[in-house]
Amino acid sequence: MSVFVTGASGHIGSAVVPELLQAGHQVVGLARSDAAAAALAAAGAEVRRGDLDDLEGLREAAAAADGVIHLAFKHDLMRDGAFPDAIAADLAATQALASALEGTGKPLVTTSGTLMLTFAGITGRPGTEADFAPGGPRVDAENFVIGLADRGVRSSIVRLPPITHSSLDHHGFAHVLIGIARQTGVSGYVADGANRWPSVHTLDAARVYRLGLEAAPAGSRLHAVADEGIRFREIAAAIGRGAGVPVASISAADAATHFSFLGGFVGIDNPVSSEVTQKLLGWTPAHPGLIEDLDHGHYFARN
């Protein structure tokens, strides 16, 4: 099928595009810069120039495609402290894409995050695909997409863990944590660091997007999760080894100062299961886990 992909030259997109092409699909990738356009063309995709603010352009591209994968997000706004603006832009873009697909039965695969499960108040057990919150940042877009199943769209949402890792990752949370460790001289965790974060390799996540596009039933929540939950102190220890800095506990009161915009997230306990997704899509993670990938060294050679 012909697939329109936003964020096609980004971290996840740079794995999703080859995954789609290798499976025999045609890809039209959204590019907002000359560099992004060149990268997409080199990968074998058709290029459509534009950005998330061009809502009419998004509608036109979605209408012309057989399916849509929405990966783009204004991460720069989030890093600059304008998270609400990034959330609003994502919801507007999602609604624009959806408006072109209603009543067609075409697939729309969009993106959310497992950290948003904290809005559902889940504690003491791994979050599952059946769990959801009534509202909140990114949750509103997620619930909107699930609701499209009743409006003639084969919609699904992929929840990514807070760390999606590989050599394709140049700006994700792993890089941020490494940068903080080097800047402060300490690889930190909050309190006793027993809270858990899930993770997935980029190439494994890309397969979830492709399989979701091809086969997920309308209204599916999918978990692209390989490591169900790694103690944050273990993540900090791996970063400490790679960066050559000591590992230390940071008090909850000092977390915002030490971890900057990540201060509100690093102490969250977010174990997440992908059992339902694996059975539904026939997907099995096949690439290295987070600690192995950090110990490989490429993050520290490039950071």
What is each of the regions a protein language model found here?
Residues 3-23:
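N-terminal Rossmann NAD(P)H-binding glycine-rich loop of SDR-like oxidoreductase domains
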Residues 26, 81, 88-135:
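Conserved Rossmann-fold NAD(P)-dependent oxidoreductase catalytic core, especially the SDR/UDP-sugar
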Residues 187, 208-262, 302-303:
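Mid/C-terminal beta-alpha module of Rossmann-like enzyme folds, strongest
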Residues 202, 256-284, 300:
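Conserved C-terminal active-site "lid" loop/helix of NAD(P)H-dependent oxidoreductases
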Residues 288-303:
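Amphipathic terminal alpha-helices
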